[in-house]
Amino acid sequence: MLPTAMRYSHTLLKEVVQPGHTAVDATMGNGFDTELLASLVGPTGQVFAFDIQEQALQVTKKRLAEKELLAQVQLIHQGHETLADVVSGPVHAAIFNLGYLPKGDKAIITLPDTTKTALEALLTRLAPKGRIILVCYYGHAGGEAELKEVHSFCQQLPQEEYNVLSYQFINQRNQPPILFCIERKNHQSSAR
């Protein structure tokens, strides 16, 4: 069977993240992506995980402690738009789950402007062959506007520098999530 957007996002991360790398979870949520990234970068790598909700930090901290992965993760109680102040680079992978915290306050959502700010900061830090993955949930109020912003942002990236993938199930009801993957091309191969 075809993988869900979430499962496919993890496949895309596993293909590029190596021990010792730096990765970003721009929307920590319940910590599943943070846990995966921490296991992939290993004790010599580093993960920066962002969320504005204290609940997300507590759940993620507990999850990471249980798996003995907390040492390589910085849990940051700030929005992903502050990424430029925290992460100096290079970043080998980043993931966003855009929408609201599952089982959380549905009035607290990610926003087009803050997501764009974070994406711009990540692009300046993205290592060659690095990936930024965005899983866009858009069935809530404000979700369509953010999806439109992400799609527009991705579509305008120069093909000489980036490959951009869109992955979605087009015959499913109830707005299934859409995945975007931005991959920086290898500088040497793009010069040919």
Specify the residue positions occupied by each region the protein language model found.
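Conserved glycine-rich SAM-binding loop
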Residues: 29-31
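Conserved SAM-binding motif I beta-strand of class I
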Residues: 46-51
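Mobile active-site "lid"/loop adjacent to the S-adenosyl-L-methionine
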Residues: 96-118
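Conserved beta-strand signature within the Rossmann-like core of class I S-adenosyl-L-methionine
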Residues: 125-136
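Class I S-adenosyl-L-methionine
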Residues: 143-192
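S-adenosyl-L-methionine
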Residues: 1-21, 35, 39, 57-88, 92
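Helix-to-beta-strand junctions that scaffold the AdoMet/dcAdoMet cofactor pocket
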Residues: 18, 41-42, 126-128
